[in-house]
C-alpha cells in the first residue's frame, strides 16, 4: 500500500499536518475554493521564488498564510514593498485581514517539491533527463538526505514510446509511518508532450507522535 499512496497523505496526523487548517460550517466549499485560488495565485505570482508549501490558517475573521520559500528576498522585495502588495491583493481575495509569514528553506536540495520543479524546468530546457536526475540525487545525498528516489515518466528524450525511468540512492521506507518522507510532483511541458516528475526524499525518523513535526523542523532550519 505504501508503494501506491501519497506519502504525505498517509502520514497526516502522525508526523505531518494539513496545509489548510481551519474549521467551517456551511461555507466550507467556498473557503476550500478560496484556498485553492490563493495557492494558485501565489504559485504563479512567485514562480521565481522557489515556493514549496503554502499553509493557510483561519482564526476568527482573519487569514494567516505561511509561505515556505527558498528565496525569501524575492517574496519580500525592496523595503518589503512586494510582500505588502501581495498582502493587499490577498485581503481583496479573502475579504478578511491577512497576515503573511515567510519561512526560508535553507536546503532547497532536500525539499521534494523544489527538486521536482527544478528537474521539470531542466527537462523543458532540453537538458538530458538522466543527467538532471543524477545531479539532483547527488546534491540531496551530499546535503544530508538518508535516501532519495526520483521518477520521470513520459516521452523522455523525445522517444516515440513513453516510458518511466527512476533513480534511487539510500533508503526510502514508504511503509514506515514514523519515517519523515517528503514527496513532491511536477510536470514538464516539452515540445513532445508532458513529462511527469515525482520525488521522494527520506530525511530520518521522527520518534515522537507529533503532527506538527514537519512544520517545526522547517522553521528550525530557517533560523
Swiss-Prot record:
Its biological purpose: Binds the lower part of the 30S subunit head. Binds mRNA in the 70S ribosome, positioning it for translation.
Query: Species name for this entry?
Result: Rhodospirillum rubrum (strain ATCC 11170 / ATH 1.1.1 / DSM 467 / LMG 4362 / NCIMB 8255 / S1)
Record key words, sorted: Ribonucleoprotein, Ribosomal protein, RNA-binding, rRNA-binding
The family line of this record is:
Belongs to the universal ribosomal protein uS3 family.
Name of this protein = Small ribosomal subunit protein uS3
The record's NCBIfam families line, in alphabetical order, gives: rpsC_bact
Please list the GO terms describing molecular function: mRNA binding; rRNA binding; structural constituent of ribosome
Q: Which domain of life is it from?
A: Bacteria
In terms of CDD domains, this protein maps to: KH-II_30S_S3
Q: Which InterPro entries match?
A: KH_dom, KH_dom-like_a/b, KH_dom_type_2, KH_sf_prok-type, Ribosomal_S3_C_sf, Ribosomal_uS3_bac-typ, Ribosomal_uS3_C, Ribosomal_uS3_CS
HAMAP family named among the record's database cross-references = Ribosomal_uS3_B
List residues of the KH type-2 domain. 38-106
State the Pfam families in the record: KH_2, Ribosomal_S3_C
The entry's cellular-component GO terms read: cytosolic small ribosomal subunit
Family annotation (PANTHER family): 30S/40S RIBOSOMAL PROTEIN S3 (PTHR11760), SMALL RIBOSOMAL SUBUNIT PROTEIN US3C (PTHR11760:SF19)
What is said about its interaction partners and assembly?
Part of the 30S ribosomal subunit. Forms a tight complex with proteins S10 and S14.
Which GO terms are recorded in the biological process aspect for this UniProt protein? translation
Amino acid at each position: 500500500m505504501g508503494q501506491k499512496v501519497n506519502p504525505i497523505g498517509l502520514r497526516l496526523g502522525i508526523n505531518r499536518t494539513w496545509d489548510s487548517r481551519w474549521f467551517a460550517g456551511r461555507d466550507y466549499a467556498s473557503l476550500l475554493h478560496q484556498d485553492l485560488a490563493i495557492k494558485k495565485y501565489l504559485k504563479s505570482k512567485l514562480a521565481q521564488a522557489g515556493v514549496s508549501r503554502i499553509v493557510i490558517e483561519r482564526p476568527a475573521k482573519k487569514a494567516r498564510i505561511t509561505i515556505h520559500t527558498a528565496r525569501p528576498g524575492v517574496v519580500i522585495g525592496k523595503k518589503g514593498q512586494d510582500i505588502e502588495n501581495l498582502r493587499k491583493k490577498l485581503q481583496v481575495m479573502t475579504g478578511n485581514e491577512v497576515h503573511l509569514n515567510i519561512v526560508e528553506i535553507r536546503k532547497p536540495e532536500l525539499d521534494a517539491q523544489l527538486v521536482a520543479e527544478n528537474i521539470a524546468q531542466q527537462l523543458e530546457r532540453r537538458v538530458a533527463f538522466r543527467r538532471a536526475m543524477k545531479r539532483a540525487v547527488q546534491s540531496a545525498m551530499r546535503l544530508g538526505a538518508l535516501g532519495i528516489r526520483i521518477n520521470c515518466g513520459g516521452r523522455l528524450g523525445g522517444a516515440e514510446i513513453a516510458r518511466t525511468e527512476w533513480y534511487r540512492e539510500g533508503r526510502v521506507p514508504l511503509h514506515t509511518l514514523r519515517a519523515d518522507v517528503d514527496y513532491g510532483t511536477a510536470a514538464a511541458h516539452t515540445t513532445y508532450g508532458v513529462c511527469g516528475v515525482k520525488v521522494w526524499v527520506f530525511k530520518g525518523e521522527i520518534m515522537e507522535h507529533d503532527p506538527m513535526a514537519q512544520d517545526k523542523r522547517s522553521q528550525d532550519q530557517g533560523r
